[in-house]
A protein has these predicted regions:
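N-terminal auxiliary segments of SAM/dcSAM-dependent transferases
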Residues: 2-108
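A short linear hydrophobic-aromatic micro-motif
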Residues: 28-33, 144, 260-264
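Proteins enriched for Cys/Gly/acidic motifs involved in redox and nucleic-acid/cofactor modification
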Residues: 91-128, 134
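Surface-exposed loop/turn positions
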Residues: 95-97, 145, 236
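Conserved beta-strand segments that form the floor/walls of ligand-binding pockets within enzyme
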Residues: 98, 113-117, 132, 149, ...
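Conserved SAM/SAH cofactor-binding pocket of Class I
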Residues: 120, 124-205
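S-adenosylmethionine
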Residues: 174-279
Length: 279
């Protein structure tokens, strides 16, 4: 599979890079690399919509002229895999978790460690939302629990759930190559409780869950929220992330209509994670 690489130069990188990540994700871009002042974004060749990209960039320039320039390049598969891996740096979630790639040579770490073959999948831990939801997971009881991970990406949340004691984890990912990446990461970590499934909302099924993790984006979360609620056991926990802090009220209101009680909001650099309990 070939990918397009979009390279955008931002003149206020610190304040705008995460915002552009969210907007580009809404038009199909899947993976991102930050090299200030440049943001690199990647999308499968078959999914690229030039008109949608031009409209987005033009609209953003009218709202806030922070784009100094951009360049689009079609990359062959063997090139983007090597490029992505070369950019991947270890991720630390406090002193509790370290996320590394197989090629990293690091000093011993006292916390939990996950080995992730980065490739192009979303969810290596670099993005604020993945970092936030990993941090929040350490506050929950996973022992013996059944877990659903929607939009699993690399499978990092599923793998962490197993390390935290979950008995069964269903990792659903709509992109075929990401679902394959989950299988690779399951093998790298010796995981035995994670089931990787290529599919979308239709793959949720009817079996009940104790915990649901969904790190996607606001629009997808709103469209799938009722499906999550339908398979949550009484007192089950739902963690939502992948959206701006300013979007949280819309998700909280929608969840309340489904009997999901808002318990907690955590923020990190304008991104949020929401915790709900099934009443």
């Amino acid at each position: 599979m070939n990918y397009y690489e979009l390279r955008i130069a931002l003149n206020d990188f610190e304040n705008w890079s995460d915002i552009f990540v969210a907007y580009l994700a809404e038009i199909g871009f899947e993976s991102f690399v930050e090299e200030a002042p440049h943001l690199k974004a990647y999308i499968p060749e078959a999914d690229y919509d030039g008109q949608a990209l031009q409209a987005l960039l033009a609209e953003q320039q009218q709202v806030a002229p922070v784009i100094d320039g951009f360049h689009l390049t079609l990359l062959a598969q063997q090139n983007w895999n090597a490029n992505w891996e070369s950019q991947f740096e270890p991720v630390y979630v406090g002193e509790q978790l370290r996320i590394v790639a197989p090629f990293h040579e690091l000093a011993p770490f006292n916390g939990m460690e996950l080995v992730i073959l980065p490739k192009m999948s979303f969810g290596t831990g670099h993005h604020q939302t993945t970092h936030l939801i990993c941090q929040t997971m350490f506050e929950l009881d996973f022992n013996g629990k059944r877990v659903l991970d929607m939009g699993a990406g690399t499978g990092v949340l599923s793998l962490l759930a197993e390390k935290l004691g979950a008995q069964e984890i269903r990792a659903i990912e709509i992109e075929a190559w990401s679902a394959e990446n989950i299988l690779e990461n399951i093998a790298l970590n010796g995981a035995t409780k994670v089931e990787a499934i290529h599919g979308g909302a239709e793959a949720i099924g009817e079996q009940p869950y104790d915990l649901i993790l969904a790190n996607i984006n606001k629009n997808v979360l709103l469209s799938q929220l009722s499906l999550y609620a339908a398979v949550m056991l009484p007192n089950a926990v739902l963690l939502l992330s992948g959206f701006f802090s300013t979007d949280a009220p819309d998700l909280i209101a929608a969840a309340a209509q489904l009997g999901l009680q808002h318990q907690q909001t955590l923020d990190r650099e304008n991104w949020a994670v929401l915790k709900f309990i099934k009443q």
